[in-house]
Amino acid sequence: GLGDSLWTDDKLECYGCANFMKAALVYSDIITTVSPSYAEEIQTAYYGERLDGLLRARKHEVFGVLNGIDMADYNPATDARIPAEYTADDLSGKAKCKAELQEKLGLTVDPNVPIIGMVGRLSNQKGLDLVDYIIGDLMSENVQLVVLGMGESRYVNLFSWAEGEFKGKVAARFAMDH
């Protein structure tokens, strides 16, 4: 077993119980989270799961790292995988890219309709309960919705339903693909 020297409030003990998450936070060199805002949130009592004090004590070693793309690899000015190249100064190729995306996903091809896109984990934590609440109203507007991700069956079912219910306006793909 573990020695008594670890059973202290500055190591493993947390409110009378062993807490291995606390131990991980205590013994890690740095602490990373999925975003800068989440790094701040977990330092509050509401999101800190009783570890907020420890996280605040180590706030200079807590970092949020944004998910993102490699701008060199996904640069529309040089990306050979897209139908047409474009830049901030010359957007002429962007319309062709949009039209091909709409066609490939079974959306109505329309250069004037805005596309709302989401790539990520389909989870209540991402606020998708709010999308569930307003999806009917949202899709009554002149918009299209593209969802790419994997996650909770509740949201897979929601977006599968929406794709059938709002033909030509919603496309959902349940895999991580670029």
Residue ranges and their predicted role:
Residues 1-178:
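Catalytic cores of nucleotide-sugar-dependent glycosyltransferases that transfer UDP/GDP/TDP-activated
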